[in-house]
Design a protein with these regions (language model features):
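Multi-pass alpha-helical membrane architecture of UbiA-family
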Residues: 2-353
């Protein structure tokens, strides 16, 4: 079944041309800007308004089981590389390290048998956060610019359906964590999700946003390790390592804001690139990345292999951030950031014998 929504063509073209010109000007200005971007409340409001009605064909798809599964996939797919994969690696690698749990002789087969549990725990918690985040009006405005393929901008899901989905997912995630392990971390993530989304921490200045994100990543890491370790508990060094992970995230997560600056400006977010300007923001990200690339191997008394992997990947990432600029390059650097965190998470297995 198809529904046709029509407006006067002249009005539509004029408004679309104005919108395209505004966003095009913002994008062009940012490419070479070194000063913070300042948008007036009027400009933010204009860019935040939904797209004007225009002549489009909206196809109503039959909502089969595959349709719903694909919708769930689209909700979470962007965080698979940044959270699910790295945090799963954190849990497995840390559980295999003799210094991070009370298991003095972890068996590879035993730990790997818990891999599906670790993946499921991370995925469920990411699903909960993503639904809570993407249902909010500000997130929808941003996603129309940065991620138009997400379910709500695409029309696969509306705000009311997303809220009801969240109501159903909440108890599922809680009881699943009672079975899988990591229930304390799951409850902590629920609180942080509420702070980040409903209390607006995501829209505060980037320092506050990064702090909440850092605590969230610490919870993901701790939960992953608890699930992977089974009946064994964490050692004092493991808790210190979790603090280091939080500091890494706090000081480098602004990397994700570099390719999203246009959508963040429309939303009115105070990210590092928008507050300090592009050039300064890049140095505030690249320098900590290189520092952690050297510090983390030292923390674990890593072998030559550990130092080499960490310094080479981290050094190349820092170089890319400083010298390979532009949205396309920044998207590649963001993916490399995810790989870099996985390299750091693997360092407990690269210690000197």
């Amino acid at each position: 079944m198809s529904l046709t929504l029509c407006t006067t063509q002249s009005e539509t073209r004029a408004r679309n041309h104005s919108r395209a010109k505004s966003l095009g000007t913002l994008t062009s200005a940012f490419k070479n800007q070194t000063e913070p971007i300042r948008l007036s409340s009027k400009e933010i409001l204009e860019e935040s308004l939904p797209c004007p009605p225009q002549e489009v064909q909206v196809t109503v798809q039959e909502r089969t089981l595959f349709f719903h599964l694909n919708t769930i996939w689209l909700i979470t797919v962007n965080d698979l590389k940044s959270i699910v994969a790295p945090e799963t690696a954190f849990g497995i690698c840390s559980a295999l390290a003799t210094s991070l749990t009370t298991n003095s002789s972890p068996q590879l087969v035993t730990v790997l048998s818990r891999l599906p549990h670790v993946i499921l725990w991370n995925y469920l918690n990411v699903l909960l956060f993503d639904i809570a985040n993407q249902r909010l009006p500000n997130s929808i405005v941003e996603d129309r610019v940065n991620k138009p393929w997400r379910p709500i901008p695409m029309g696969r899901l509306n705000e009311i359906e997303a809220r009801r989905l969240l109501l159903g997912v909440l108890p599922v995630v809680f009881f699943a964590s009672l079975w899988l392990g990591g229930v304390v971390e799951t409850v902590a993530l629920m609180v942080l999700t509420w702070m980040y989304n409903d209390l607006g921490a995501a829209d505060e200045v980037y320092v506050v946003r990064n702090l909440v994100n850092a605590m969230g990543f610490m919870c993901y890491s701790a939960g992953s390790l608890n699930v992977a370790a089974g009946d064994y508990t964490l050692t004092p060094k493991a808790y210190t390592w979790l603090i280091v992970v939080g500091l890494i995230i706090f000081s480098t997560l602004s990397m994700q804001d570099l390719p999203d600056v246009v959508g963040d400006a429309v939303r009115g977010r105070m990210t590092a690139p928008l507050v300090h300007g592009d050039s300064i923001a890049r140095y505030t990200i690249a320098l900590p990345i290189f520092f952690w690339s050297v510090y983390c191997p030292w923390f674990f008394d890593a072998s030559v292999l550990g130092y080499t992997c960490s310094v080479v990947v981290g050094g190349y990432l820092a170089f890319r951030i400083l010298f390979n600029r532009g949205v396309a390059n920044d998207k590649i650097s963001w993916k490399l950031w995810c790989v870099w965190t996985m390299v750091l998470y693997g360092l407990p297995l690269m210690v000197r014998s």
